[in-house]
Amino acid sequence: MTLPVLIAILLTLNLCQCGRFGCPTRVQIKPCLCNEKSRGLDISCENAKVDQLREALASVAQTKQAIWYLKLRNNHLGTLPAHLMVGLDVRHLIALHCNLSSVDELAFSSIADKLETLDLAQNSFERVPSHAMENLTALVSLNLNYNRLEILHAEAFKGLQSLLRLSLYGNRIKFIDNLAFVGVGRNLTRINLGANQLTAVPSRPLRNLSQLQRLQLHENHIEALLPEEFAIMGGESLDVLDLANNRVQTLPPRAFMSLQVLNSLDLERNLISTIHIHAFQGIEDSLEWLKLGVNRLEEIPSQSLRNLSRLRQLDLRGNNISKVREDDFTPYGKNLKFIYLQNNWLTTVDPIAFVSLDSLEWLHLQSNQLNTFPYETYTPILNTLQVFDIHDNPIHCDCKIAWLRDWVQNKGASVVKLAQETKCETPEDFQNLPLAEISNDQLICVAKASIHYAAIFVQVFSTTAWFLLS
């Protein structure tokens, strides 16, 4: 074998090492790193200048290998330049913390029909780089989280015909043009607009997105929910609606009437004190997951929930509810599997409150003011419960609680959560002792009659002693 042939073989091996997707040598792509994945190369470049990136990526291009991930992190670029990715076959591009505020119109020209994911989060964009993205016909996911966007202009996502997921979380968006989503493909199924500055549901901009399934509007400044807003939007495919952490005070009648396939509704951490009896009209046969935690409710809104025949989860944690009434879960409770009532002010549970809960698996009653757990109240649900949490309640430990102590040590051992934190508050001898550590013969009840006669005896004894000593 001649020397020139040997050198050529060595150079070839250097550029395209063994394995289906061979990485260039570390020296060739410094300061980038390369790892081989089953579907292509994983290239990561950090703390690099533009010229260094051009040189490194040019070396990668010579391998003719597919790049599954190209990750650019902490590179001070300002602008994503043109022709940086010439000759590359990139499927997923991530450019985080690169101080990007713009993208050259030719930046994606060589990968426009290949790029499936574009992540430009944690940069400095004040405007969606629409023109640069217009030809990304294969793009499925776009992430612009944590930038400085204040408005979404008309046709902001024009040309993104394959887009399924769009995330705009953590910007400063106050205004969305009614034509913002014109030109985007009708396949868009998920939009995250959380942690912005919206004051109303952006129904008109969203009205033509007929395939939208998940809409996240949490952590905004929305104060009212109007039925006409969702009617304008359409929402015939909307499955998940997240409105948590807003400023909603009341749920009006037929608020979600047009969202007839809505399966999950999150309204936790608002200011809700009133729910109209017909608030959920129109979604009775679809709603399964409902979060109303950390609001200002003073009772379980049973009249409003009564027709939710498919409801599986009811989350009412962190409200001002003081009692569970006998019909609070009637008749909709038959399919309920998860009930969250922790961090309320519960002092009373009606003896027949849980009778209709045939499918209940999780019951959270921790951090309330319950001092007793009568057997007859909880026996209807003991066979189905998988999680039962009652810690941080002022439990009075006497004979009436003996059944619970036995259950915790036997069948309920895997069901009762934080058993060692489920402690007695009274009587004083048992204060702060875990219920499970108290024996049955210690759990006694003093009859009221005995207490009455003991008091009479003390009074008579005291009177007699006074006469004898006087």
What are these regions (language model features)?
Residues T2-S470:
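Extracellular leucine-rich repeat
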